[in-house]
Amino acid sequence: VIGGDECNINEHRFLVALYTSRTLFCGGTLINQEWVLTAAHCNMEDIQIKLGMHSKKVPNEDEQKRVPKEKFFCLSSKKLYLWDKDIMLIRLDSPVKNSAHIAPLSLPSSPPSVGSVCRTMGWGRISSTKETYPDVPHCVNINLLEYEMCRAPYPEFELPATSRTLCAGILEGGKDTCVGDSGGPLICNGQFQGIASWGDHPCAQPHKPAAYTKVFDHLDWIENIIAGNTDASCPP
């Protein structure tokens, strides 16, 4: 996270860290005792999930480790672009109980509105020019923008005219998610609305906001998978 501050230790009980070997490479969000929602591009062979973590170096007493029991992707018949359906549900190998630093974040009850102030967080890079990673998660407030603001700066991607992605950032630059924040939550007006998906490099440039998978559009799929209907289809 660029341009943010260390998160309050009590404000991110739902935030999980995805590790492969000993490297923290993505974030995710605990949505109930057994399920984590993250980005599809965070899929790796040997994922370890740390819950209830704040500092990488000083563990919380209630920190927990899990591994995926099952992973589900939102597959569509369309060609799978990086920015399309960047969502993955992970079922944990055993449930976690709520504790001082662990509690799920509920799914959104209404769609987000452009102009909302949103909070995002993660252990990703805190410098857009240097590979500086923090020991603690950083949090930042950014604005929910019109989707076109994410489409216009990237003509080379030939992005579709409408999309199940949200666009969020600060037009003057300086605040953004960055490498290592993928899969983490975007929380707008207290509701879990987005999953960090992609952005430009270097991060936090003016007029180069980032894209977040729109959780609200995938609610039916999420609820179906959790209910055991594993051949649930994705929104078109």
From Swiss-Prot:
- In which tissues is this gene expressed? Expressed by the venom gland.
Is Disulfide bond among the key words of this record? Answer: yes
- PROSITE patterns in alphabetical order: TRYPSIN_DOM, TRYPSIN_HIS, TRYPSIN_SER
Q: What is its EC number?
A: 3.4.21.-
Residues covered by the Peptidase S1 domain: 1-227
Name one process (GO BP) from the record.
proteolysis
Q: Identify a single GO molecular function assigned to this protein.
A: toxin activity
Record bears the keyword Disulfide bond: yes
Query: Cellular component per GO?
Result: extracellular region; secretory granule
Key words of the record: Disulfide bond, Hemostasis impairing toxin, Hydrolase, Protease, Secreted, Serine protease, Toxin
Q: Which cysteine pairs are joined by S-S bonds?
A: C7-C139, C26-C42, C74-C234, C118-C188, C150-C167, C178-C203
Location comes to: Secreted
Protein function: Snake venom serine protease that may act in the hemostasis system of the prey.
* Family stated for the protein in its record: Belongs to the peptidase S1 family. Snake venom subfamily.
**In its UniProt entry, what is this protein called?**
Snake venom serine protease pallase
